Amino acid sequence: MVGTMWKVIVSLVLLMPGSCDGLFRSLYRSVSMPPKGDSGQPLFLTPYIEAGKIQKGRELSLVSPFLGLNMRSYAGFLTVNKTYNSNLFFWFFPAQIQPEDAPVVLWLQGGPGFSSMFGLFVEHGPYVVTSNMTLRDRDFPWTTTLSMLYIDNPVGTGFSFTDDTHGYAVNEDDVAQDLYSALIQFFQIFPEYKNNDFYVTGESYAGKYVPAIAHLIHSLNPVREVKINLKGIAIGDGYSDPESIIGGYAEFLYQIGLLDEKQKKYFQKQCHECIEHIRKQNWFQAFEILDKLLDGDLTSDPSYFQNVTGCSNYCNFLRCTEPEDQLYYAKFLSLPEVRQAIHVGNRTFNDGTTVEKYLREDTVQSVKPWLTEIMNNYKVLIYNGQLDIIVAAALTEHSLMGMDWKGSQEYKKAEKKVWKIFKSDSEVAGYVRQVGDFHQVIIRGGGHILPYIQPLRAFDMINRFIYGKGWDPYVG
């Protein structure tokens, strides 16, 4: 069945036409207050599950056609903590090709506090929002071949919300527990997908979320009656191991010409102090140093990086500012007809600031042990855009070289492979290092928001990885 499906995928590809405001700031986070007009009522699906009215809840979650959207999808809220009334918002798109067999892929945005609606509308969902608030079809949507589940995570992100401050996550264990509750409910509403292969994916700060939820699934599957069919994970430009990344910032920024010798020395000194605090588990102090030096998330003044480079964008070192069209989606989500269709009503679209404040101490902590566990047991894809600054390819590779997993020695000796999509291509798509089920990919011409800049390369990469078709070019 998979072989047949892959032939369809390749045929489809052959027929197709050929802010970053920072890791933690406002590129993904445009606050959308409740709009004027009839936005309908929020749909909470947990009561339907508990009452045994699953089919009714499923029918209500169907997204009605609006503004040109005609692809079947489902959306609503899943309650993950009744005590605090904590709810996660999801939007699910069954694959356009053979959804009954296609893998289910969970997408988590970074931040912390960035909505996965950014991934949906800016990166790889079926539609792109235009400047006049209409939709156009995306050329290479991941929803063609994969059933994509977008969740606003953690609680307090995007449309997800809680009624109590105790409902906010303060560490990755909290994040994983809420996600796990949502996933179990999701597969109750859509039981026909529970045996499909399941992958957890995400980018940036989701380099923590992805290993966290994968670790919890791995731990609970042997002892729970309801099991999630986890097959692997994919992390793009992931902030999984802050210490190894922070230590390389100064030299990297110097080598790409954004810092001079004097600035590099100051940057290195600050990074060294940050790492010292990390090693002493002074998490808050480490966060403050990094925030003032580079991120500028919770400070009132521009960061040192912004002052000396004059640039706010460190998702792509060829651009100084963020593309305007990456912000259209937030305005689109404020339209009453959109809110009514996706069943969020007048709920505020949160900017993520509160989420980040509660996760400040988590920011500089590593999830390397969990990532190692997943690398030892599942398929793993770690990818980077060539032009990224905040989680540069070289910094990710440095982190990987320091990991101790079953393939670590072989990985250190492995040769990098040139990856082209088609044999006739004059351009190289990227570079791959593969050891067993572990794949490290660097995408040429890509930035932190990879599918936005390189949609075809991102589409080809994720399908090669999930469907296990290797990295040899297609004939065509």
UniProtKB/Swiss-Prot annotation:
Alphabetized UniProt keyword annotations: Carboxypeptidase, Glycoprotein, Hydrolase, Protease, Signal, Zymogen
Sites where a glycan is attached: 81, 132, 307, 346
EC identifiers of the protein: 3.4.16.-
Active site feature: 204, 388, 448
Biological process according to GO: proteolysis
Gene3D superfamilies (alphabetical): alpha/beta hydrolase (3.40.50.1820)
GO MF annotations, alphabetized: serine-type carboxypeptidase activity
PROSITE patterns: CARBOXYPEPT_SER_SER
The keyword Signal appears for this protein: yes
Signal peptide: 1-22
Record family assignment: Belongs to the peptidase S10 family.
Role played: May be involved in the digestion of phagocytosed particles in the lysosome, participation in an inflammatory protease cascade, and trimming of peptides for antigen presentation.
PANTHER family xrefs: SERINE CARBOXYPEPTIDASE CPVL-RELATED (PTHR11802:SF472), SERINE PROTEASE FAMILY S10 SERINE CARBOXYPEPTIDASE (PTHR11802)
The protein, known as: Probable serine carboxypeptidase CPVL
Organism expressing this protein natively: Pongo abelii
Biological classification of the source: Eukaryota, Metazoa, Chordata, Craniata, Vertebrata
Name of the encoding gene: CPVL
